[in-house]
Amino acid sequence: MEELGVKDSKKMTDEKILQIVPEIIKKIPYKSAILSNKEYNERYSADTNMNKLKAILHNKVLVQLTNEIKNWDYVIVDQFAQPFVYFNYLKSSNAVFKRITFLTKGEDKSLAVACASLISRFIFLKEFNKLGEQLDMFLLKGASDKVDEVGIKIVEKYGFNKLSEVAKLNFKNTDKIKEKISK
């Protein structure tokens, strides 16, 4: 993995991630869970925030992976919430995987976490590109005036409801798009 240059995905370009992750996934077992923007918007609410959604998805893949792979020593999760908060998010889940070591900045401390981060980013990039192809538009990532302009084009071409399928509506971009459209 080190030969491939595995490190924190935030320290790598998207191009490099797209190049090396196919090699990584040939060598290690993994599971993924994709939450579409539409599903995210339906589930996100006053009592369900992004960290709760992440906890639910992390737990889902950990349960699947550890059920399939019996020969493992420990599980590390890049800490995005305090452990008691993480497990509180899962209180209504049927199966909860609990044998977790939480590490802040886990990608810097664990090769396995760095690989998981890269695989997640790879899947995100592939899904993001598919979304752009479906819309017949080049989509931009992040938050900027240019991203807002693309959002406006989506609304003009497909209507505002389409935005809920391609964007997280609780982000500030949505308010800016609504404001610009209403002028």
Roles of regions detected by a PLM:
Residues M1-K183:
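RNase H-like, Mg2+-dependent phosphodiesterase core
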